[in-house]
Amino acid sequence: MARPGQRWLGKWLVAMVVWALCRLATPLAKNLEPVSWSSLNPKFLSGKGLVIYPKIGDKLDIICPRAEAGRPYEYYKLYLVRPEQAAACSTVLDPNVLVTCNRPEQEIRFTIKFQEFSPNYMGLEFKKHHDYYITSTSNGSLEGLENREGGVCRTRTMKIIMKVGQDPNAVTPEQLTTSRPSKEADNTVKMATQAPGSRGSLGDSDGKHETVNQEEKSGPGASGGSSGDPDGFFNSKVALFAAVGAGCVIFLLIIIFLTVLLLKLRKRHRKHTQQRAAALSLSTLASPKGGSGTAGTEPSDIIIPLRTTENNYCPHYEKVSGDYGHPVYIVQEMPPQSPANIYYKV
């Protein structure tokens, strides 16, 4: 017979084996090589841009580098766009802002997590075997930060093509610049946009580095025609809070109604119980007479206490009637009192 220690060790080994098999069966997520969003980055190939092949669970950091001495700082606004927008280098319609590079004194790092389902309703969501595009139509200067046409997307092909869950060996070089069908544009991503001046300071304690996570961004979603309008986001939040508040009010009203109903039922039950108790107390007073009396006394004779007036008792009994059955006596038992306090009720 196995000892308890051996049983525990066997269960532990089985659990470790199952865990190892699950880890082997599940592809390990990894951090992809960060992308520096700068015109000096040689990874942005002319006419093609930068193509990456992330898997579900991977993470990608897009870095806005700090200003270097002797070189002007490059201002960019990065968008997650549809295939036709990336091909035309246009963000006029439905602009979905990812991050804004507008802080020369610090490095800004934007992290993208490739996940099919996001715990944040404003987070990014990706699907396998789909292409996603990131580009910028800014020209690098502060004055051209808000450009919606051309920019470095057209002049330097600064764009990232993310082929999620796809095999890099199965893609030919001619397919790198092709756009996906427009029917897939609606399923690209649930986008979280960021206004240039609405993001608070998220940098480190030295004030030289800033990390922006896609789950922490706020703004309108990518679906629908109002994704570029900030009012749409606030309206959606107001509608959400209004729905939650209405649900709470309805829940409180139901609780109050049930509480009042329960109190009424308990009060009615208590009143009914008191009435039954009073009836039982009267029935106990009317008890049959015992058979230990004389021979002429019948066992069915009933003794009923005489009602009194003004709490005065009368030690008197009277035979009420015996014409239609057994005689009935009304008897009031009490300790002897002075004759002055005795009243007879006729």
Curated annotation (Swiss-Prot):
Phosphoserine found at: S281, S287
Stored SUPFAM superfamilies: Cupredoxins (SSF49503)
Membrane-traversing stretches: 238-258
One Pfam family this sequence matches: Ephrin
Biased composition (Basic and acidic residues): 205-218
Gene Ontology BP, a term: neural crest cell migration
Domain Ephrin RBD: 30-164
Tissue-level expression: Widely expressed. Detected in both neuronal and non-neuronal tissues. Seems to have particularly strong expression in retina, sciatic nerve, heart and spinal cord.
Signal sequence coordinates: 1-27
Localization terms from the record: Cell membrane; Membrane raft
Cystine pairings recorded for this chain: C64-C101, C89-C153
Residues bearing carbohydrate: N139
GO cellular component: cell surface; cytoplasm; extracellular exosome; glutamatergic synapse; membrane raft; nucleus; plasma membrane; presynaptic membrane
Topology feature Extracellular, residues: 28-237
PANTHER family named among the record's database cross-references: EPHRIN, EPHRIN-B1
Subunit: Interacts (via PDZ-binding motif) with GRIP1 and GRIP2 (via PDZ domain 6). Interacts with TLE1. The intracellular domain peptide interacts with ZHX2; the interaction enhances ZHX2 transcriptional repression activity.
Function comment: Cell surface transmembrane ligand for Eph receptors, a family of receptor tyrosine kinases which are crucial for migration, repulsion and adhesion during neuronal, vascular and epithelial development. Binding to Eph receptors residing on adjacent cells leads to contact-dependent bidirectional signaling into neighboring cells. Shows high affinity for the receptor tyrosine kinase EPHB1/ELK. Can also bind EPHB2 and EPHB3. Binds to, and induces collapse of, commissural axons/growth cones in vitro. May play a role in constraining the orientation of longitudinally projecting axons.
Linked pathology: Craniofrontonasal syndrome: X-linked inherited syndrome characterized by hypertelorism, coronal synostosis with brachycephaly, downslanting palpebral fissures, clefting of the nasal tip, joint anomalies, longitudinally grooved fingernails and other digital anomalies.
UniProt name for this protein: Ephrin-B1
Organism: Homo sapiens (Human)
Gene coding for it: EFNB1
